[in-house]
């Protein structure tokens, strides 16, 4: 589980980045 390896702070940033990538792909 990635969320378990990274701090909550980084996890949120990662989620944001993932959403942005998803928008770019769509």
UniProtKB/Swiss-Prot annotation:
- Compositional bias (Basic and acidic residues): 9-26
What is the species listed in this Swiss-Prot or TrEMBL entry? Cucumis sativus
Q: What is this protein called?
A: Photosystem I reaction center subunit III
Query: Mostly located where?
Result: plastid
Instruction: Report the protein's function.
Output: Probably participates in efficiency of electron transfer from plastocyanin to P700 (or cytochrome c553 in algae and cyanobacteria). This plastocyanin-docking protein contributes to the specific association of plastocyanin to PSI.
List the cysteine pairs that form cystine: none
Please tell me whether the keyword Phosphoprotein is annotated for this protein: no
What are the recorded Gene Ontology BP terms?
photosynthesis
Q: Where is the protein found, in the record's own terms?
A: Plastid, Chloroplast thylakoid lumen
Signal peptide residue numbers:
none
Q: Where is this region: Disordered?
A: 1-26
Name of encoding gene = PSAF
| Family (UniProt) | Belongs to the PsaF family.
Instruction: Return the GO cellular component terms, semicolon-separated.
Output: chloroplast thylakoid lumen; photosystem I reaction center
The protein's UniProt keywords, in alphabetical order, are: Chloroplast, Photosynthesis, Photosystem I, Plastid, Thylakoid
């Amino acid at each position: 589980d990635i969320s378990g390896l990274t701090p909550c702070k980084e996890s949120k940033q990662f989620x944001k980045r993932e959403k942005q990538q998803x928008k770019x792909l769509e």
